[in-house]
Structure formats: structure tokens, C-alpha cells
UniProtKB/Swiss-Prot annotation:
It comes from Xenopus laevis (African clawed frog). Brain and kidney. Pfam families: 7tm_1. This is D(1B) dopamine receptor. A lipid is attached at residue 361 (S-palmitoyl cysteine). It is a multi-pass membrane protein. It is found in: Cell membrane. The gene is drd5. Glycans are attached at residue 24. The chain crosses the membrane at residues 42-67, 79-105, 115-137, 157-181, 206-231, 283-309, 327-351. CDD domains: 7tmA_D1B_dopamine_R.
Amino acid sequence: MYQPFQHLDSDQVASWQSPEMLMNKSVSRESQRRKELVAGQIVTGSLLLLLIFWTLFGNILVCTAVMRFRHLRSRVTNIFIVSLAVSDLLVALLVMPWKAVAEVAGHWPFGAFCDIWVAFDIMCSTASILNLCVISVDRYWAISSPFRYERKMTQRVALLMISTAWALSVLISFIPVQLSWHKSETEDHLLSNHSTGNCDSSLNRTYAISSSLISFYIPVAIMIVTYTRIYRIAQIQIKRISTLERAAEHAQSCRSNRVDSCSRHHQTSLRTSIKKETKVLKTLSIIMGVFVCCWLPFFILNCMVPFCDRSPGHPQAGLPCVSETTFDIFVWFGWANSSLNPIIYAFNADFRKVFSSLLGCGHWCSTTPVETVNISNELISYNQDTLFHKDIVTAYVNMIPNVVDCIDDNEDAFDHMSQISQTSANNELATDSMCELDSEVDISLHKITPSMSNGIH
């Protein structure tokens, strides 16, 4: 049978519908769109609120722990951890909430506060990154020259380093922003600012590149160099300690004529050495990986956006523009680093005990640490007593009193030492320790008188 409407497309069929039907469909689509928008706003707001509260909680916990417990407060190096926590706390207080409200509302509702907020954003983010850089330099200095570090790293020196980082953060934020040196001079930017409810933080090319160099690229280069050298020091000293452990175990085992035991000890020590090297590499990879993954995408875009072609007839045509949504996502990725720093830098053994005391969760808190984080702070420790260096030497001499003469003269394993960490779990001497040569101390196994009379020749 012939059907008169079977060859008509959807637009032609719609033209035959009554105005009431079309209006109802339009209202239905609009209602559905609003529901999806509200649902998206609720999800976005909830996630951002959770991120802000976690950042506040973690960094307040770090600051409270150091202020309330004297043994943490007495360590000079914890000043750097507190400074990092303060900068991250300011990110959560002065930067995140205002942007979160703007994300949910869909516009900037705070008017002229935009310029001050931009200055706070640049200052707090830069301070956080520079504090991470200072911590890496502090750790490298402590590991490469521990005795010199113990003498020269005073509270005054630490405060001077921190003050320099904060002063630089203020200089590249408030002064340029208040003098409007940071703004893009295009008509698009001038017309799309506070009057349209948009806090456009578009930067001119000169300021975008110079501020990115100071805030990120130079600090990340320093961190890569320092942590690479820390890994090399750790790798060398793990092998040296493993050599001494094998010699000591060989002497003790062969003293009882246990040949099979000698071979087993050698294989076990070699596996332990490889395991410890892997731990150090994993630790440093986490520290650098988290930092780079959070901040690198933003700073790449930050340098790209000023060179964008914003309109077809733009006089400074260049790269295609990045969408505002994409840019905002990577901005939040950078700020999220402030929520991860307390986990990475403060969750070592000492801090975990204090946190469990503050939170009142006792045994449950102390038995649920993140293992990788624990490794990161105990392998790269810089709060230990330098007397432990001498203890290691004495212990090894007691274990292998006269076997020292059998060691090749070219291998002065403990001419000068530096400690990276100290084990306490099973009393294995220097199992998780790493040593580094230091020109200020002359400790040689050949120069120490054996303390046991029944040594093996």
C-alpha cells in the first residue's frame, strides 16, 4: 500500500508537526540539558571540594606535628618540610577555593579581586615548587658531605634558604601583577576581563616565559641533577657496603668450614644489593615523577598560550589555541601536587608516629603506611647522627678483624663516609644504609687495630 510520508526526511516530518509539539520537545531538550549541567556541576564541585579539604588536612597535620613535638622541631631539616607545607596550605586557602567557585558557577563572581587572586596563584605555586627545589639541594648536600653539612646547616642557614625562595616568589608575582606587566596587551584580553565576569589570566609572551623559567624549568633542572647524583651516590655505596657484608659473612661462615654457606651468603648479599638499588631508584622516580606529571603539562601550555592564534585576523597569529577547559584541567593538576607533597615528604617513620598520636588512631595508623612513601623518606634520610658513621666502621672491623688485609689496596671502602639511612627493624648492620666519601674524615680499615684476637689470616 502507498504510504505518503515514507520518503520524507526528519526535517520535513517536523514541519508537519504542530507548534505545541515542537515547543514541548524544545522545552524537554532544554530541561535535559540543564539537568546534565547541574549534575556536572555537582560532580565537579564535589571533587574539587574533596581535593581542597585533603590538601588542607595533610598540610595542617604536618605543621601541627612539627609545632607540638620537640624532637621534630629540633631538627633543622624539618624547617624545609614546614615551609613546603605552609606554601601548599596557602595554595589550598588563597588559590583553590576561588577557582573552584568559578568552575562551578561558570564565571568569575569576585570582580576586581581577580588581579590579587592571580598574584596569590603565582606566588603560592612558585613558593611550593621552589621549596621542593630547596629540599632536593638540602638532601644532596646532606648525603654528599654529611660532616660538613652537620657543621654548616644551622637554623639560620635554613631560614636564609627558605627566605630566598619566598622572596623570589613574591618578586615574580605581586610586583608584575600589580603593575600589570603580566597582562597580554591584545584588545581581546582587555575586553574580556572583569566586565564580562571572566578572570582571564592570559600572560604576555615575555612574562610567561620568564616566570615559567623561574617558577618551574630552572628548579626542575636542579632537582633532576641533585636526585640523579643522589642515586649515583646511593648506587656506589650500596655496592661498597654489600662488598663488606659479603666479606664479613664469608669470614664468619668459613671460620666454621661451611663452604655451602659461604656461597649462599654471597648470592643473598648480591640479591639484597640489587633490591636496595631498585628501592632507591623507585623512591627517586616517585619524587620526580609526581612533581613532573603534575606541573609539566601546565607550564608547557603556559608558554604556548601567549603564542596562540586567538582569532582568524589576529595580528600575532601562531599556534592553535588550547581550549579553556583543557587549560583549567592542567591548572588543577598542578595544584593537586600540593595535596601529594605531605604524603611524599612527611610520611617517614618519625612523622607517622606523631600523626598516629595526633589522630588518636594508635596501632591502626602505624601499621597502614604507604610502603613506597616510607621507603622514600628512610632511604634518603638526612636527620641521622654522624656518630653512626663511626659505629658502622667499628662494627665491620669487629666482624672481620684481620681479613681486612686480604682486601685489595685499591679499594678503601671507608676512607670517608656519609650515611643515607639507618635500619632498626632486624638489627642488620647497615642493611639499608649508604655511605659516601667525604674529604674531611680519614677513616681507613687498615689503620684500625683489630679488637678480636682470634682473627683469621
